[in-house]
Amino acid sequence: MSNRKQARLEAKRFIDTLSVEPYPNSQKSYLLGSRPDIRVPVREITLSDTLVGGSKDAPIFEPNEPICVYDTSGVYTDPSHDIDLYKGLPKLREEWIEERRDTHILPSMSSHFARERLADETLDELRYGHLPRIRRAMGQHRVTQLHYARQGIITPEMEFVAIRENSRRLAHQDPSLLQQHAGQNFGAHLPDLITPEFVRREIAEGRAIIPCNINHPESEPMIIGRNFLVKVNANIGNSSVSSSIEEEVEKLVWATRWGADTVMDLSTGRNIHETREWILRNSPVPIGTVPMYQALEKVNGVAENLTWEVMRDTLLEQAEQGVDYFTIHAGLLLRYVPMTAKRVTGIVSRGGSIIAKWCLSHHQENFLYTHFREICEICAQYDVALSLGDGLRPGSIADANDEAQFAELRTLGELTQIAWEYDVQVMIEGPGHVPMHLIKANMDEQLKHCHEAPFYTLGPLTTDIAPGYDHITSGIGAAMIGWFGCAMLCYVTPKEHLGLPNKEDVKTGLITYKLAAHAADLAKGHPGAQIRDNALSKARFEFRWEDQFNLALDPVTARAFHDETLPQESGKVAHFCSMCGPKFCSMKISQEVRDYANNQTLDTTVIDLVMPAESIQLAMQDKSREFLASGAELYHPLVKEPIEE
């Protein structure tokens, strides 16, 4: 059996047998809003107690507070829900959308291509079995979150994300959890409490977006903006030579489990329409696409044969399926193409290269630019956010921050203001490949020219010498630009520049980028960002191994690495690990020093460095006698348990 067929069969088995799989020692809980159907998911990590004294027979313990963390996994980790990928997810937002009474059900699909696919009986086996009804705005209504925010309306979606951003952090009582460095936020406004009104105001000003198409009611609202937690996007999608619908659905579920805040379906292979339907109906997070990829497939891959009519039909098709945001490369103008002639790597964006070829073939202006207002009209009818693509992003550090890149960026700023005229939500895409010392200039230029619309970057990669490790080279740049103010980071996997990522690559890319985003939140001084770090550090110092595993971004890998060398159960309570062993564990020695100081009723926070020499000598003699009396052994050996064969 071929590797490709084997992968598809394994993915099919995953879909057929998928069941709820909670994280270790965690439970799904929901924070309630002002109405019963605003139920915001969080993951609550239960911690073990801390030994604080007593004896072996009568130990005294102190409880540790559970830690609540942001959760993107949807009902896939909720034991109260029965998973059935063939039926899709609950329609969380359906009632909210209906209550606004500004949309109606369409009698049929608006897209000619979508109607053709529906009529094709040969696709019945591939097609998702429970196609939803299609909604569109009534008449001239605009049904975007930006429109409501500008009208002073706080929607359930806005309240949902306000609760989600706070995630119960204000409920913590342990002062050791709440300590936090001030951070440097570079002008961001980070309130101690995110309120629904704050969310509304940020959206109204264009500084944040909630991507939530009215035809994707299954999605759990989330917010992208400089003044909120840094978010992470994961890319999935098939190609002409790899992957299947089953594999892409498996990647979707896998990505949300490991923290993807949004997912982009970048499919360029067969059955793009059907693949996307399966993804949308089973996605608890917003889904983005690059409509140009599918439009190109419709003209058999010949860029110069693209037309506005084909593109418009594709936009309608995807908007009515429920795509939450479109990447549109409307800022790449004909006159910018010659600016790339002296680049080391030319135009590396797929969408950008397609547009550049079309412009040169016809010697006409980019049709996405000339028809941009029509694009905005479509988006306003379905609440599709625009992610304005950087078709001229640098593909090597040699090309970073050049004339072509920043010329396009300025045009994206002009397009942002046009989109806002139609109440369409906007974010701006950024590079790319940028060395560390040039990264901040990218953020500064974006804020200056794009009116503080959220920035969304691919990395950036900080060096070009690491094929196979580009998740690391880009994670460095992602952490930096997130600190400077980037709102969402698009992950890079180890397969970047080498091939289509598989399931494990998706996980590796996501964990790397969740780390980068969290590091950025810490550096910005985002309120509550350090709580999880403090909890894990406390568990580490107290040798609560199980808590260390469970608080980690990847509990599975943390446990596996520990158990490679200390697989016995006693290793989970030992006061050392295999790095230093029992004799050289700095934390164990530090604990012994602290315990001794406490037993001597010394103040461990204030040490008298001018203690009389006579007192020091007496104390040293006491400890010498104690050491000799105990057998003169520096460390007492632990009783080892046999390893079961």
UniProtKB/Swiss-Prot annotation:
Q: Which UniProt keywords apply?
A: 4Fe-4S, Iron, Iron-sulfur, Lyase, Metal-binding, S-adenosyl-L-methionine, Thiamine biosynthesis, Zinc
Q: Which residues bind [4Fe-4S] cluster?
A: 577, 580, 585
Q: Where does substrate bind?
A: 235, 264, 293, 329, 349-351, 390-393, 429, 456
Alphabetically, the GO molecular function entries are:
4 iron, 4 sulfur cluster binding; carbon-carbon lyase activity; zinc ion binding
- Source organism superkingdom: Bacteria
Q: What class of enzyme is it?
A: lyase
In this record, what's one Pfam family? ThiC-associated
The note on the cofactor says:
Binds 1 [4Fe-4S] cluster per subunit. The cluster is coordinated with 3 cysteines and an exchangeable S-adenosyl-L-methionine.
Family listed: Belongs to the ThiC family.
- Give the protein name, as stated in the record: Phosphomethylpyrimidine synthase
Q: Which organism is it from?
A: Vibrio cholerae serotype O1 (strain ATCC 39315 / El Tor Inaba N16961)
Q: Which gene encodes it?
A: thiC
